[in-house]
């Protein structure tokens, strides 16, 4: 079973995506902020990380950059999910280490 770490602080978004992905047979792990996302990435070693960018405690850009510095998890693909729609937000996410936006 494919394991996905979803780093998101909005409960409505978590509910919606969790329902859809679980119906498709994915195992979902939830983290509510960037630091928790880093911790869960190390603990759970997911196949994919879906990263919100606007998070409390540590934003998704910073969390992504930190994950990419950790040998154990640096190769996990990270896809940024965000309401930020400006090209500079996309560029910043890709520079931080996201595989896609």
Listing of model-derived features with the role each one plays in the protein:
Residues 8:
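Conserved acidic carboxylate
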Residues 15-23:
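Charged docking surfaces used in two-component/phosphorelay signaling
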Residues 44-50, 55:
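Active-site beta3 strand of CheY-like receiver
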Residues 25-32, 40:
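Short hydrophobic/Thr-rich beta-strand motif most characteristic of the beta2 strand and flanking loop
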Residues 14, 56, 74, 86:
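The feature encodes the CheY-like receiver
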């Amino acid at each position: 079973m494919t394991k996905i770490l979803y780093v998101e602080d909005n409960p409505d978004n978590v509910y919606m995506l969790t329902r859809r992905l679980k119906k498709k047979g994915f195992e979902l792990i939830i983290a509510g902020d960037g630091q928790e996302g880093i911790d869960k990435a190390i603990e759970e070693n997911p196949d994919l990380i879906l990263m919100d960018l606007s998070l409390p405690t540590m934003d998704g850009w910073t969390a992504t950059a930190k994950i990419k510095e950790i040998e154990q998890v640096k190769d996990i693909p990270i896809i940024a999910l965000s309401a930020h729609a400006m090209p500079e937000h996309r560029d910043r996410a890709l520079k931080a280490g996201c595989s896609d936006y």
